[in-house]
């Protein structure tokens, strides 16, 4: 009932009186199955303003009791120049609200991946935040966030939904959420090749990543920060046709069999090597893939 109160508060913008809050704080939550917790948490996430329910959950002790990975965000400082809104918890609530506005037209499993990615994206900050050279830094927090994000998903028993691997996408979003902004900054310096986009698409849905990165950028003081990087990132991904998945391999085992290659480790190595060339863009069609394979075979036999 306490969890239901949170999602009702979020869905209907309700407030709770003090006696009700006091009563909720006395109710034990340690015997709830993961499926029940997820059922209420999912409804909370799809409220118009999920932050209302999350903030109430913190006030009632629910976040501390059920989600220690989220509770660790409370009071975790951020560099004021980049995060004038406050600590990581405050920022996360704003990002979740922004993410909720970016779900239109997507199937439910992808919507869940976006919302959970927004919740989990900065879970690596508590373990990495330090004061360095006069600045609050959270170096490598995106990669370090994968482990606490995994624990968080375990608490909800959240894996695949309707055949879609939500868990993999949430972890991918967490690990890669800085890429759109970083690559945008690098594009006029060392540049970011098409191969980088194709390879990143092996790790995460680039469309979902861009949407969460946009929510992350806007989940601060409104109107202060330039968030056009995410539009650029989405346009590049769409132009390459890798917004949802990496390119399908052009060269297949049957093509190598026709060249006289027997099934086995050598075939696997050839397929992998030619696919890497495809990702780089040096192989663009079957003729090119076959030529690359013949060259590799000849080199190995020389």
Over which residues does each language-model region extend?
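Glycine- and charge-enriched loop/helix tracts that form the active or gating conduit
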Residues: 1-115, 119, 123-140, 144-162, ...
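Alpha-helix initiation/capping motif
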Residues: 17, 33, 166, 193, ...
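Histidine/acidic-rich helix-loop-helix segments that form or flank divalent-metal centers
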Residues: 76-84, 158-227, 242
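Short amphipathic alpha-helical segments and their helix-coil junctions
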Residues: 93-100, 191-197, 250-257
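Short hydrophobic/aromatic segments of transmembrane alpha-helices and their interfaces
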Residues: 107-108, 202-203, 239
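Active-site lining segments that contact anionic ligands and/or coordinate catalytic metals
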Residues: 111-115, 120, 169-171, 205-212, ...
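Terminal helices and disordered tails flanking the catalytic cores of nucleotide-processing hydrolases
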Residues: 184-190, 217-302
């Amino acid at each position: 009932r306490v969890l239901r109160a949170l999602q009702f508060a979020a869905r209907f913008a309700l407030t709770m009186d003090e006696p009700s809050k006091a009563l909720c704080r006395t109710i034990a939550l340690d015997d709830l199955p993961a499926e029940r917790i997820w059922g209420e948490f999912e409804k909370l996430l799809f409220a118009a303003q999920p932050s209302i329910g999350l903030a109430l959950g913190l006030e009632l002790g629910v976040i501390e009791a059920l989600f220690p990975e989220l509770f660790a965000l409370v009071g975790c400082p951020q560099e004021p120049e980049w995060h004038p809104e406050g600590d990581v918890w405050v920022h996360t609530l704003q990002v979740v609200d922004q993410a909720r506005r970016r779900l239109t037209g997507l199937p439910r499993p992808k919507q869940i991946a976006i919302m959970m990615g927004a919740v989990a994206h900065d879970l690596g900050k508590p373990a990495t935040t330090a004061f360095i050279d006069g600045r609050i830094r959270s170096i490598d927090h995106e990669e370090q966030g994968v482990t606490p994000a995994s624990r968080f998903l375990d608490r909800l028993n959240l894996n695949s939904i309707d055949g879609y691997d939500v868990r993999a996408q949430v972890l991918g979003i967490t690990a890669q959420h800085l890429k759109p902004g970083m690559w945008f900054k690098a594009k006029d310096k060392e540049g970011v090749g098409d191969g980088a986009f194709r390879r990143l698409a092996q790790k995460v849905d680039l469309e979902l990543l861009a949407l969460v990165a946009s929510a992350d950028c806007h989940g601060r003081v409104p109107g202060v920060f330039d968030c056009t990087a995410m539009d650029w990132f989405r346009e590049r991904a769409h132009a390459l046709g890798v917004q949802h998945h990496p390119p399908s391999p052009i060269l297949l085992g049957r093509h190598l069999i026709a060249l006289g290659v027997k099934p086995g480790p050598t075939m696997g190595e050839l397929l992998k090597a030619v696919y890497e060339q495809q990702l780089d863009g040096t192989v663009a069609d079957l003729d090119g893939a076959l030529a690359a394979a013949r060259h590799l075979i000849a080199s190995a036999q020389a």
